[in-house]
Amino acid sequence: MAIHNRAGQPAQQSDLINVAQLTAQYYVLKPEAGNAEHAVKFGTSGHRGSAARHSFNEPHILAIAQAIAEERAKNGITGPCYVGKDTHALSEPAFISVLEVLAANGVDVIVQENNGFTPTPAVSNAILVHNKKGGPLADGIVITPSHNPPEDGGIKYNPPNGGPADTNVTKVVEDRANALLADGLKGVKRISLDEAMASGHVKEQDLVQPFVEGLADIVDMAAIQKAGLTLGVDPLGGSGIEYWKRIGEYYNLNLTIVNDQVDQTFRFMHLDKDGAIRMDCSSECAMAGLLALRDKFDLAFANDPDYDRHGIVTPAGLMNPNHYLAVAINYLFQHRPQWGKDVAVGKTLVSSAMIDRVVNDLGRKLVEVPVGFKWFVDGLFDGSFGFGGEESAGASFLRFDGTPWSTDKDGIIMCLLAAEITAVTGKNPQEHYNELAKRFGAPSYNRLQAAATSAQKAALSKLSPEMVSASTLAGDPITARLTAAPGNGASIGGLKVMTDNGWFAARPSGTEDAYKIYCESFLGEEHRKQIEKEAVEIVSEVLKNA
């Protein structure tokens, strides 16, 4: 992808959304019956779209909220539904729509007091803490399109295990929501917001303080405080600003929030690689503001708007997410003595093979799963996975005692873990990675995209290993051709080809007419580029007939 000529530069007035217009479009524009682009598509990250594109409007959210209310009733979930929202412009009207429908369905709802914002991990944690006490089970809804641009909206559902809903649940919600849309919302129960707030079904609580105080159960906050590290946080205008403020105060940390603005245009952002405003804390372009301040701090952090992702900045720059995952795993499994010896590491099959080498050295079991955090939920929930992480800078891990903290991605604990590592060892995570690279080799990793039609994407997701005729990759014998994940046998929706010195994986994009290729080599950049070239050839050959 070509880099935009203003990538990494501050946003200008001409880059900003018109919040009033976008909000009006939420209420005025309607999805067109029979138009697939306007339908509800409920993946594990929920449904995402934009009001301007007729894909995230009031009818969508009313239908989704009704479908969730029916699904939880069908499954006997009668406890509270924790509803959180992030700072995107469309999150506010969608939040109102959800409350109107849930209250009309007699669902008890818990929201952050004073109309505050709630990160994804705080919703997951609240669900788990509530359900541990026994009694009627709680679940949750988070209104967020994650790191997507300011014009986008999103909504996702977390069942009582606290994690992202599995496909069998999301398919039911999607189908029912689309049926309600097709029927003109006739089956949707709804009362006004005033009636909802007066119904007794909507309860306001402070969800911030219990989360902040609970952090001592999962991260060595005392060590961070004692070390006196200078920490910087750029909340990127997201849902966790109040959380970072209270963390600094409660644990008496030397923590500076470099920008505490909430602005639905996200005008304080630097433009991403493609020139868009995108709150991606793993992008050097989007993180240019915090990177310019890196010499002022021992460590600096950022999160995306719903705080399920992390960005770690050392004086050397922004850490590669794959590199930090390897460091986090290496540290945690040597500093959590209460975790049993059978506790495993979960990784997605497009994450770096450096993780494989670290886990093997630790003598731990590695469970490699398809892309998507949903594959880690059960393992984190029952304590059989100590850690689960994705190359897209999303991860979670267990408390000190081996019980779950958040079964969804938690950007806050991953940032604080970087501080713990630095405080306890005297070396920051980048320095730890440099040591791992000396021991295990320094892999060269890249992800690229190539255009693909819908038919080609469908063909790629249905590949079988024998359809790959090549016997070598970049000069090395192919040791494995995978279309199912080795950790759980689930389809990977694509292909992974491995050698002793490198690998590539190809899978269709869930949101664009393209497929993604992930490549890695332990023999350097030139070797990786050869893998990339041959990967494109292998995939093109397979797709030629599609």
Swiss-Prot record:
Catalyzed reactions: alpha-D-glucose 1-phosphate = alpha-D-glucose 6-phosphate
Cofactor(s) required for function per UniProt: Mg(2+)
Keywords: Carbohydrate metabolism, Cytoplasm, Glucose metabolism, Isomerase, Magnesium, Metal-binding, Phosphoprotein
Alphabetical list of CDD domains matching this protein: PGM_like3
Binding site for Mg(2+): S146, D304, D306, D308
GO cellular component, one term: cytosol
Cofactor remark from the record: Binds 1 Mg(2+) ion per subunit.
Top-level taxonomic group: Bacteria
Residues given in the record as substrate binding sites: S146, H147, K156, D308, R309, E390, E391, S392, K409
Family per similarity comment: Belongs to the phosphohexose mutase family.
Protein name as catalogued: Phosphoglucomutase
Organism: Escherichia coli (strain K12)
